[in-house]
Each structure stands twice: as C-alpha cells, then as structure tokens.
Amino acid sequence: MIFVHDKGRMANNMLQYGHFYAWGREHCRKTMSMRFAYKYQYFHICHTRYHNFLSYVFAKYAAKWGLIPTLHFDDKDADYSDYEQQMLKRRLLVVTGWEARWYDLFLKYKKEIVQLFAFDKAVEQHTSSLLHDGLRLGVHIRRGDYASFHGGRFLYSDEQYVSVIRSFVQLHPDKEIMVYVCGNDPNLNRDYYRQQLDGCEVVFPDGNPGEDMCLLSHCHYLIGAPSTFTLVASMYRNLPLYWIEDPALPMTEERFKTFDYLFQHIY
C-alpha cells in the first residue's frame, strides 16, 4: 500500500493523488489518499476502501515513528527512478510532495481518476438547482494567497476581471450568458459585477469548495487566474479554460485550452 500524503489545497491534493493513483494502477500497487480519508468529503473517493480516519491515523503515526519510510517528491525535474523502485518493492510506504509527475499515465487513467473524484449526490443536487439555460461561463476569482503567489502577478482587480468577462461576451454576441462567479474573496464587490455586466445574469453561488468546483465543472467555459482549482474543474468534461495570464491580451477562442494541455503547464 502506498499512502499519499499532502497538506496543500483541495485541487492540488486531487492532482497530486491523480498522479500517484495512475502510477499505482500501471504497476499494480494500491494507493490511498490520506487527505481525502478525512478532509474535503465531497467526493466518491472519500467513501471507498481504506479512505477512513483509522487508515489515516495509522499511516500518519507509522511514518512519524519511523515504522514505514517516507519518500519526498519535492524537487522539480529530479530523477525519481530510485523512488519508483522503492515504490515497487516496499509493502508499505508514504509518499509526499508536489513534484510527482507521470503525465502519460495520468491521461491513460484519467477516466478512472474522474470517477474517483465524482461529486457526491448531495453536491450534484445542490448544483442542479443553480443551473439555468443559456451559455454558462464559470469565473473563478482568486485573491488572498494570490497577493504573494508569483509576486502577486495574478492578483487581478475587479475591473480587470470584468474587462475579461466582457471580452468573452463579445465573442458570443447572440448568446444569453449566465456568469457564475466563485472565489475566495469574502469582500467581493458583487454590485459592481452586476452593474458592469448588466447584459448577463450574474450568479454568486456562495458554495463550499466542493460545490463551487462542481458548479464550475457544469459550465460551458471557464475563466480565471492560473490556478489548479479551475484546472481540475475543467478536467471533468474537458471544458475550454482561459487562464488570465495578461488581462490586457485580446481574447480569442483559440486562447482557451483544455485540461490535457494545461495540467502539463502549471505555474
């Protein structure tokens, strides 16, 4: 058994486990996500075998007391072939770190990964109540930690987000557009978005992380600052995703990318 450990945010945990799961499937090794054994209880994986608090506690303290080894995947572009040999040979071990990457295997087992992270029925039912006809645009506004992420490069103002949304609207002049705005800014100026996007219906779902991700996954297009949250939301249905790398850049349909490309180009 390979116990996958991480302390990051939900979407990062999903991607990290996806890589280890895919490697395990390819090499007939069972894997278990320590994170989803007790946290972010929105997904099918949380109800599968081994994903429970007892398994989490066992792995945590067995590693802490040195009873099972821990492999750290912390260095980008490092050669982890020795680690892979240990993952093949050792009966029990813990793996941790963000730099585990098996892109081809992830894509090979992507359908299974999506099924593991299928949203619970209650989450889907909540989302269904918010969905309306028309072209659904999901917008993820990232603030908070983005003040320091890459030196604040992707910390955009409301004016910049609205400008990008307007560019999207101009690409679809004959469509009725629903704009679903999610994010981590509790002080977001909602009235500003409603006033500036008066030709669209603007919805602020106020969901938890699982509900927000589920809602975004049911949109037709996604827009946001580069983030694993929108990336994973796009994974479920191969949605076109526009990462705002330069808010002044003219928007075109060609600038939208899908998960299979973007997950290999994470910031």
Q: For the regions a protein language model found, what residue spans apply to each?
A:
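Short amphipathic alpha-helix
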Residues: 16-23
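Donor-binding and catalytic core of enzymes assembling or modifying cell-surface/extracellular glycoconjugates
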Residues: 10, 170-245, 251-252
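Gly/Pro- and small hydrophobic-enriched strand-loop and loop-to-helix capping segments
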Residues: 25-34, 236-267
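A short, glycine/small-residue-rich beta-strand->loop->alpha-helix junction that serves as a flexible
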Residues: 5-15
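Secretory-pathway luminal glycosyltransferase catalytic domains
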Residues: 39-176, 259-261, 267
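Short, solvent-exposed turn/loop segments enriched in Gly/Ser/Thr/Pro and often Arg
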Residues: 34-41, 183-184
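Short hydrophobic beta-strand segments
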Residues: 1-6, 30-33, 93-94, 132-145, ...
